[in-house]
């Protein structure tokens, strides 16, 4: 049987869709060429970071000793918009390509057989419709702006320390122009991109969950120890830049707390441990949705392979242990011990 092909699977994407993508497409900024991706990342940095630098320089809070936290000394803000923000954009292309390859591998590996192809394509179309829906990104945007709308303007502040965000006050009162830009434009924009990645991860997990229900041709003796689904871990590894971006933001905020607010590294251990646990769960969770299917495949294989191994072992024992081997047959050089070991090894994999 030849390799299955599907134009629906070949066009699979979790990043090339949604209201913001369509807006970028209209202005010619959504193409996947490397130069255009770099321009998108640079444009995002220009919008989020450059105005903060210009406005804080104008009011004298970009550098110097008159403030405890001048703009250029604020680890959290600079790491967020000069390191994490471009990563969230630059990672889109490589992660999306890897996801597409994994989707196609379901067909190339024979996990999806021809009778299940329509169901497989239906799952892709369902996930694509969710990706293109306006409502999810609208909710993400609302959440991203919620802290500003409800008056929580303290994201860049460190206790009562004077800073570029609200010089001399250390509160949300009397925000500088740079502080207003941060709260209205920069911070919500970053949160939107980060939350949109969480949405994409949910879509990927949803795809895997639905696909695991369509009747995959799983092989319990597969040497990847996951019945042939071990390749899915490659997609989670490719997601590591997003985890790194989040980790950089957390680390920079911890740096601010230690440098300017008198915190200690030991005192911040729960923050660091908490993010570490969250990052692990984020990487592992999409794979966990296949667990019920794998458990079912294992249970079925234990019975079927167990019966086969039992029958083979009984025949081997009858022939070679009980002494019923044909006249002239010798165990040395015979294929029976080899088949016994091979079948036993397969059962151990199960």
What are these regions (language model features)?
Residues 1-218:
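Transmembrane-helix bundle segments that line or gate the permeation/cavity pathway
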Residues 224-242, 263-273:
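Membrane-water interface at loop-to-transmembrane-helix junctions
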Residues 53, 57, 101-105, 109, ...:
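Generic, well-ordered alpha-helical scaffold segments in large soluble proteins
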Residues 54-56, 136-161, 241-260, 340-350:
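Alpha-helical transmembrane segments and their membrane-interface junctions
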Residues 104-123, 163-171, 205-232, 291-329, ...:
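Juxtamembrane inter-helical linkers in multi-pass membrane proteins
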Residues 244-258, 263-277, 307-311, 315, ...:
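Terminal membrane-anchoring module of integral membrane proteins
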Residues 39-50, 237-248, 275:
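Alpha-helical bilayer-embedded segments of polytopic membrane proteins, i.e.
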Residues 268-284, 288, 292:
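C-terminal structured domains
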């Amino acid at each position: 049987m030849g390799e299955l092909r599907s134009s629906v699977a070949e066009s699979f994407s979790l990043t090339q869709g949604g209201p913001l993508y369509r807006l970028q497409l209209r202005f010619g900024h959504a193409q996947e060429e490397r130069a255009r991706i770099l321009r998108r990342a640079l444009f995002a940095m220009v919008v989020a970071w450059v105005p903060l630098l210009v406005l804080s320089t104008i009011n004298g809070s970009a550098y110097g000793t008159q403030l405890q936290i001048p703009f250029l000394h604020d680890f959290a803000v600079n790491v967020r918009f000069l390191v994490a923000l471009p990563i969230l954009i630059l990672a889109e292309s490589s992660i999306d390509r890897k996801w597409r390859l994994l989707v196609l591998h379901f067909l190339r590996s024979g996990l999806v057989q021809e009778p299940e192809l329509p169901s497989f394509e239906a799952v892709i179309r369902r996930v694509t419709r969710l990706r293109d829906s306006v409502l999810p990104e609208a909710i993400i945007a609302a959440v991203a702006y919620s802290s500003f709308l409800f008056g929580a303007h303290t994201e860049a502040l460190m206790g009562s320390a004077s800073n570029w965000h609200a010089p001399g006050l250390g509160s949300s009162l009397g925000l500088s122009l740079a502080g207003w830009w941060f709260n209205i434009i920069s911070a919500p924009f970053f949160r939107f991109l980060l939350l949109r990645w969480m949405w994409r991860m949910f879509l990927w997990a949803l795809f895997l969950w639905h696909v695991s229900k369509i009747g995959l041709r799983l092989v319990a003796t597969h040497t990847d120890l996951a019945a042939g689904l071990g390749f899915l871990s490659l997609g989670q590894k490719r997601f590591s830049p997003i985890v790194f971006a989040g980790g950089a933001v957390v680390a920079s905020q911890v740096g601010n707390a230690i440098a300017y607010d008198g915190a200690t590294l030991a005192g911040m251990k729960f923050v660091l441990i908490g993010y570490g646990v969250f990052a692990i769960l984020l990487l592992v969770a999409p794979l966990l949705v296949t667990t019920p299917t794998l458990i079912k495949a294992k249970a079925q294989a234990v019975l079927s392979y167990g019966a086969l191994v039992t029958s083979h072992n009984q025949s081997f024992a009858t022939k070679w242990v009980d002494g019923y081997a044909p006249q002239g047959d010798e165990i040395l050089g015979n294929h029976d011990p080899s088949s016994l070991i091979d079948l036993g090894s397969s059962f151990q994999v199960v």
